Amino acid sequence: MNSTNQSLKPLTTKINEAGNLEIGGCDLIGLAEKYGTPLYVLDEETIRKICKDYKNAFKAYPKTNMMYASKALCTMATSAIMSSEGFGFDVVSAGEIYTVYKAGADMSKVLFNGNNKSADELTLAIELGVGRISVDNFFELALLNEIAKSHKKVVDVLLRITPGIECHTHEYIQ
């Protein structure tokens, strides 16, 4: 899939009447003066356009789920935008679970990933209705089963299977 935006700059980038660079109607000099630098400025129009491009690229495959990797940038604003575009979320912590929840995400479209998940994180995931939990080892599976039973919930899981090949990674996913 080729991006429709072949430029590095956001779609709404322009030079305004003051001669300053502007993105999404915001004068970047003014933002820098108000918030300091470095400063990350995202363009909602560009983000939404990219989301639509991805959805269009995969529309021939209706069972495809678009997932935003929250570890890239997990804020209320980005989560709300991605959710409103119909994306699910790949989250790796309680903070990310809570952020996408507060942003109004459809929690059934959330996948809780990551190794060494704590009992508190698994409990939060179950209580907030996370759609699937990726399980990395037998200990985590037993812990999740215990927590799910105590909440009288059935949890959809994805099992990470390792074929016994040494890859020198985190001990919890060996």
Residue ranges and their predicted role:
Residues 110, 160, 172:
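Short glycine- and Lys/Arg-enriched binding-loop motifs that mark or flank ligand-binding interfaces
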